[in-house]
C-alpha cells in the first residue's frame, strides 16, 4: 500500500469514528471522559478537558477504560442473557426475560404473602446511576413496603453521612475541588489520596507548586505515597483518629486558636464539647496515637493558625466501629476554628464510588428516604408517600448491609436481590456471607459481569448494561451532577438496571391488582424528573436543573433550585446550617479503641486499602493485564523488623489468621509501617487468591475482616482486624505462566478457579501488555496429583511432543517449556522455582531462546550471562520499570532528578499516578551493587 493510499484509509477510518462525552466509572472524583467508538466497540478514551472535575486528566485506570470494553473480553465476562436454575448445585440455564421476570414476580408475591414484606431484601450499589437507584428505592419502600434495601455505600460512606448529619444537619459535603487551589493547609487523614483519588491528588500537587507556602499534613498508620509527600506526617496507631482530633482541638483551645465569635453566632454545644476534650492533653494524645507531642502540637498550630484549612478524608475514617465519631470529631475541629463555609476550607469527605453521592441523594440506604429525608421523621415519610401516591412508607428502618446478610443466614430474609455489587468479595466475614447466600431460598443477582464470586451463588442472573451503555446521571464528591450518555447500544439481551426493576414492578403490581402503576416511566429522564421534584425545598434542591441544562451547560453542582443560574460551589458561607436552630452542632466524641484489640494470640494490626491500579473487586480492572504490573500478585506487607523476627524473606508464604478465618499469602517487606502492623490490598478476593482451607475454600482478604459496625452509621470496621501471622511450611510449589489468546483469557481464569481450591494456597493473575498472559501459582503440604498438574498445564497449551521437559522425580522438580516461533510461549515449574524470574522475563520480553540451548532445562537458578531484570513496573502508562529508573538515577550528575526522569524516560508525564513513587525512589538510597559500581 502506498503512503498516499494508507493516508486515505486512515482519514476514512477517522471519519467513521465518533466521540461522545461520558464519565469515568471508577472513583468518586467523577472525571469526564471522551469515548471514541466505531459504532460497534469502544476504541479509545481520553480525559474531557471541559469537565471541571479533571480538566482532561485521567489516571491509569481511567485511561485504560477502553481496554475493559474489548469485544473478546466482553464475550467472556459479560452476562448477556437471563439465566435461571431451579435446583441448587446445577448450572443455570438460559431463559427469556418474560419467563424470568414472571418467575421472580410470582416468587416474591408468594414469599411476601407467607412471611411479610420484610422477608425480602435488596442489596444495591454506588455504581448504579441515580435513576437506577431511585427506581429500586421506590420498588422496595413504595411498592413492596419494606425498608430492607441497602447499598454497598454502607461499606464506604455511611459514617460520613452520619457525621455530616449529626454536626451540620444534612449529608452535604460543604467544600469543593476548587478549595484545593485556595487552601493554606491541606489535612489528609484516612486516605491514600495519591492512590485512591489520583486526579484530585494531581490538583493538590499543582496547588503546592503554585503556592510553596501551602502546607500538607497527613495522618495515617502507613507511610503511604501520600504521606511521603507531606510537610508533616503523623503515623498514628490504627483507630486513634478521634484522640488525634480531640487533642488538636485541646491545643487550639489552650492556645486561643478557636474562633469564639463564630462559635457563639453559628453553633451550639461547645461548652459540653470543651468538657470532653479537656482530658486530651498533648501527652495523653501523643501516647495514645503513637506520635510525638511536638508533631501533635505543630499540626494543631498549623491548622488553627491557617487562613483556610481543608480536610480530605475517606475510608480510614469511615470504615470503623467509631467511624461516625471520627467524622464528627474532625468536623468539630473545623467548626471551632471556623474552617468551614469559606474558600479553601472545610471538612471534605471523598467518595469511593462514582455515584455513592447519588445513592445518598435518593435515600438508597435502609434508614433514609428520598432527598435526604429521614425515615424516623413522620413528616418526611408523609412527604414521600404523597410524592409516590401511596398511603404510607414503613417507619421501621430496614436491615443495613451486615444485618441483612445476618438475617438472610438466620432465615428471617428469604429472598435477596443483589444489584451491581459483589458481596462475596467485598463484605466482611466472608464465611458468614457465604453461609447466608447458601441458606437463602432465592438469590437474584443483577450484574453486567458473570465472573464475580457472587454470581456463583445466583439462582437467577439478570444481565444489565454497564459503562458506555447506560444513560442517566451521577454525582461526584463535590456534589456535581454529570449527565451520562450511552456510547454503544445494549449488548445481547441486557437491559438498563432501572428497566429491569420496572418490568418486575409492573408484574408485581398486576399480581396484586393495583389500579395504577407507581412506575409510569418510559425513559431515564422521566425517572430523574420525579427525583428532581422530590428535592424541592430540600438542602439538595435541584429543581432548577434538567437533562437539557446538563447537556448544554455541562456538569452542575447542587443545590441548584428553580430560578438559579448556577449551582453552589461551597455551602454554609452564610453561617446558616440545615438544623432546627440553624446552628451547627458540636458533638461529644470520646475516643474508643478499635473494635478488635490485638493480644498475645492475635498480635498484628491488619489494615486494608487500595492499590494504585486496581479498583474494588477487580471485575473490570482485573480484565486488563497491564493493570497488574504495579502489584502483580496478592501479598501481605510487613515491616522489615517483623520479617526478620519471623525469619521471612520476600515471597515466603504465611498463614494470616483472624478470629473469623484464614488466608495464606506471600509476605513482602515494606518500609511504610511500624512493627506489629500489616497491610493487604482490599481487592484480593477468591477470584484471584484462594486455597483449600477447611475444605470449602478460602475467600481472600475479607475472610479476615470483622463485621462489627458503628452503632450510628452501621458501617463495618473493614479497616482493621487483629491477626496472627505464621510462616506456612508448604514444601511443594508450582508456577505456570504463558501467553493466552485474548478470546480465552477470562475463560481460562474461570476454569482454573475450582483447581485453586485443591491446593493449600493458589493464586491466579494476569500479566503482559500488548499480549496478555495468565500466571497460576500454587503451594501445598505434599506434591499435587500428576493428573491435576497435567490438567492445569494443558490449559496453557503445555501438552504433547513439542514440549521441552526436564523431570527429576527424586527431588520433585520439573521444568516444562512450550516454545513457538523460537520464543517462550508457556512455562511450568514444580519444586524448584528459582528460575522463574528470568524465564518469565524472557517470555514477557519475547526474546529468542535458541542461544540458551540446554540452559532452558538445566536445574539451575542462574540466569543467562546477559540477563538483566527489569524489575517492577512503576510507570504503567509508558511501561517504565524500577530498574530503568534506578539506572537513569545512577547516571544522573545532579539537579532536578524528577525532571530528568520525566524528560529521559517520560515516566510521570502521562497520568501522573506514578509521580509520588518516583519521588520515593529518588530519595531512597541506591542498591548496594549500584553504589559499589
Describe every region a protein language model picked out:
Residues 12-22, 40-57, 861-872, 891-910:
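Immediate flanking context of iron-sulfur cluster ligation sites
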Residues 86-93, 255-293, 370-371, 375-382, ...:
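N-terminal leader/propeptide and maturation segments of large enzyme subunits in energy/redox metabolism
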Residues 134-205, 212-217, 242-246, 334-457, ...:
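Extended redox/cofactor-interaction regions of prokaryotic respiratory oxidoreductases
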Residues 1-257, 265, 269, 273, ...:
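N-terminal export/assembly segments and adjacent metallocofactor-ligating motifs
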Residues 599-621, 797, 861-900:
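C-terminal accessory/binding modules appended to enzymatic or scaffolding proteins
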Residues 491, 497-553, 621-637, 641-797, ...:
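Long, contiguous, secondary-structure-rich segments that constitute the structural scaffold
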Residues 760-856:
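C-terminal catalytic lobe of FAD-dependent flavoproteins
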Residues 21-33, 55-65, 871-884, 903-923:
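Local cysteine-cluster metal-coordination motifs and their immediate loop/turn environment
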Amino acid at each position: 500500500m502506498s503512503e498516499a493510499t494508507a493516508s486515505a484509509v486512515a482519514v476514512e477510518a477517522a471519519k467513521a469514528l465518533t466521540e461522545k462525552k461520558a464519565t469515568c466509572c471508577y472513583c468518586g472524583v467523577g472525571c469526564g471522559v471522551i469515548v471514541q467508538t466505531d459504532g460497534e466497540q469502544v476504541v479509545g478514551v481520553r480525559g474531557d478537558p471541559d469537565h471541571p472535575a479533571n480538566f482532561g486528566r485521567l489516571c491509569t485506570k481511567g485511561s485504560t477504560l477502553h481496554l475493559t470494553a474489548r469485544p473478546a473480553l466482553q464475550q467472556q465476562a459479560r452476562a448477556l442473557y437471563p439465566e435461571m436454575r431451579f435446583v441448587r448445585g446445577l448450572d443455570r440455564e438460559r431463559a427469556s426475560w418474560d419467563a424470568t421476570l414472571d418467575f421472580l414476580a410470582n416468587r416474591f408475591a408468594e414469599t411476601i404473602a407467607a412471611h411479610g414484606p420484610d422477608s425480602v431484601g435488596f442489596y444495591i450499589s454506588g455504581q448504579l446511576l441515580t435513576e437506577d437507584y431511585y427506581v429500586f428505592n421506590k420498588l422496595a419502600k413504595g411498592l413492596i413496603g419494606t425498608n430492607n434495601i441497602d447499598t454497598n455505600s454502607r461499606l464506604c460512606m455511611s459514617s460520613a453521612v452520619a457525621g455530616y448529619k449529626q454536626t451540620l444537619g444534612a449529608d452535604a459535603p460543604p467544600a469543593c475541588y476548587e478549595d484545593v487551589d485556595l487552601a493554606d493547609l491541606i489535612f489528609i487523614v484516612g486516605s491514600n489520596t495519591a492512590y485512591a483519588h489520583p486526579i484530585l491528588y494531581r490538583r493538590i500537587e499543582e496547588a503546592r507548586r503554585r503556592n510553596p507556602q501551602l502546607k500538607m499534613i497527613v495522618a495515617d498508620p502507613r507511610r503511604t505515597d501520600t504521606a511521603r509527600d507531606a510537610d508533616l506526617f503523623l503515623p498514628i496507631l490504627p483507630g486513634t483518629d478521634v484522640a488525634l482530633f480531640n487533642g488538636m482541638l485541646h491545643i487550639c483551645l489552650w492556645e486561643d486558636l478557636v474562633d469564639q465569635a463564630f462559635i457563639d453566632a453559628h453553633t451550639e454545644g461547645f461548652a459540653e464539647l470543651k468538657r470532653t476534650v479537656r482530658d486530651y492533653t498533648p501527652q495523653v494524645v501523643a501516647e495514645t496515637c503513637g506520635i510525638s507531642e511536638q508533631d501533635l502540637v505543630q499540626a494543631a498550630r498549623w491548622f488553627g493558625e491557617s487562613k483556610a484549612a481543608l480536610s480530605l478524608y475517606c475510608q480510614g475514617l469511615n470504615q470503623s466501629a467509631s467511624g461516625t465519631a471520627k467524622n464528627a470529631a474532625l468536623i468539630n475541629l473545623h467548626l471551632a476554628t471556623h474552617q468551614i463555609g469559606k474558600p479553601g476550607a472545610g471538612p471534605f469527605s471523598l467518595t469511593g464510588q462514582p455515584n455513592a453521592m447519588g445513592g445518598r441523594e435518593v435515600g438508597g440506604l435502609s434508614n433514609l428516604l428520598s432527598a435526604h429525608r429521614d425515615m424516623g421523621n413522620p413528616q418526611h415519610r408523609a412527604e414521600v408517600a404523597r410524592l409516590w401516591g401511596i398511603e404510607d412508607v414503613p417507619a421501621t428502618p430496614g436491615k443495613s448491609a451486615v444485618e441483612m446478610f445476618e438475617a438472610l443466614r438466620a432465615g428471617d430474609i428469604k429472598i435477596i436481590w443483589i444489584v451491581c455489587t459483589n458481596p462475596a468479595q467485598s463484605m466482611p466475614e466472608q464465611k458468614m456471607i457465604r453461609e447466608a447466600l447458601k441458606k437463602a431460598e432465592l438469590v437474584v443477582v443483577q450484574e453486567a459481569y458473570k465472573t464475580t464470586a457472587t454470581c456463583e451463588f445466583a439462582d437467577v442472573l439478570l444481565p444489565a448494561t454497564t459503562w458506555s451503555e447506560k444513560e442517566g446521571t451521577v454525582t461526584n464528591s463535590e456534589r456535581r451532577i454529570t449527565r451520562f450518555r450511552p456510547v454503544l447500544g445494549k449488548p445481547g439481551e441486557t437491559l438498563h438496571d432501572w428497566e429491569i426493576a420496572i418490568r418486575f414492578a409492573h408484574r408485581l403490581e398486576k399480581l396484586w391488582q393495583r389500579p395504577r402503576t407507581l412506575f409510569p416511566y418510559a425513559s431515564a429522564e422521566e425517572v430523574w424528573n420525579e427525583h428532581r421534584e422530590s428535592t424541592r425545598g430540600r438542602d439538595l434542591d435541584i429543581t432548577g436543573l434538567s437533562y437539557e441544562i446538563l447537556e448544554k451547560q455541562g456538569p452542575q453542582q447542587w443545590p441548584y433550585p428553580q430560578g438559579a443560574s448556577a449551582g453552589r460551589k461551597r455551602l454554609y458561607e452564610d453561617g446558616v446550617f440545615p438544623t432546627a436552630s440553624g446552628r451547627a452542632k458540636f458533638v461529644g466524641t470520646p475516643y474508643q479503641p478499635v473494635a478488635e484489640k490485638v493480644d498475645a494470640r492475635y498480635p498484628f494490626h491488619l489494615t486494608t486499602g487500595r492499590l494504585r491500579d486496581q479498583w474494588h473487586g477487580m471485575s473490570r480492572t482485573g480484565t486488563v493485564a497491564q493493570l497488574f504490573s504495579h502489584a502483580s500478585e496478592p501479598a501481605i506487607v510487613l515491616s522489615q523488623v517483623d520479617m526478620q523476627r519471623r525469619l521471612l524473606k520476600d515471597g515466603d508464604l504465611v498463614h494470616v489468621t483472624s478470629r473469623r478465618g484464614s488466608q495464606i499469602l506471600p509476605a513482602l517487606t515494606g518500609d511504610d509501617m511500624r512493627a506489629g502492623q500489616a497491610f493487604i490490598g482490599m481487592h484480593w478476593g477468591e477470584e484471584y487468591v484462594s486455597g483449600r482451607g477447611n475444605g470449602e475454600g478460602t475467600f481472600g482478604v475479607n475472610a479476615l475482616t470483622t463485621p462489627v459496625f458503628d452503632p450510628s452509621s452501621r458501617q463495618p470496621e473493614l479497616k482493621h482486624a487483629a491477626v496472627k501471622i505464621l510462616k506456612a511450611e508448604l514444601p511443594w510449589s508450582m508456577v505456570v505462566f504463558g501467553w493466552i489468546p485474548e478470546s480465552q483469557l477470562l475463560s481460562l481464569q474461570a476454569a482454573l478457579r475450582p483447581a485453586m481450591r485443591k491446593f493449600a494456597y493458589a493464586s491466579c493473575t494476569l500479566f503482559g501488555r500488548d499480549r496478555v498472559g495468565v500466571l497460576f501459582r500454587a503451594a501445598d503440604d505434599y506434591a499435587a496429583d500428576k493428573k491435576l498438574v497435567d490438567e492445569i498445564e494443558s490449559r496453557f497449551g503445555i501438552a504433547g511432543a513439542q514440549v521441552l521437559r526436564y523431570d527429576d522425580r527424586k527431588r520433585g522438580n520439573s521444568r516444562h517449556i512450550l516454545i513457538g516461533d523460537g520464543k517462550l510461549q508457556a512455562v511450568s515449574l514444580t519444586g524448584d522455582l528459582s528460575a522463574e524470574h528470568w524465564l518469565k522475563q524472557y517470555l514477557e520480553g519475547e526474546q529468542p531462546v535458541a542461544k540458551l540451548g540446554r540452559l532452558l532445562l538445566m536445574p539451575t537458578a542462574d540466569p543467562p550471562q546477559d540477563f538483566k531484570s527489569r524489575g517492577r513496573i512503576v510507570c504503567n502508562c509508558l511501561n517504565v520499570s524500577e530498574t530503568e529508573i534506578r539506572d537513569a538515577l545512577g547516571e544522573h550528575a545532579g539537579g532536578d532528578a524528577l525532571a530528568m526522569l520525566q524528560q529521559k524516560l517520560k515516566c510521570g508525564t502521562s497520568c501522573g499516578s506514578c509521580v509520588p513513587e518516583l519521588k520515593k525512589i529518588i530519595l531512597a538510597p541506591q542498591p548496594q551493587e549500584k553504589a559499589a559500581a
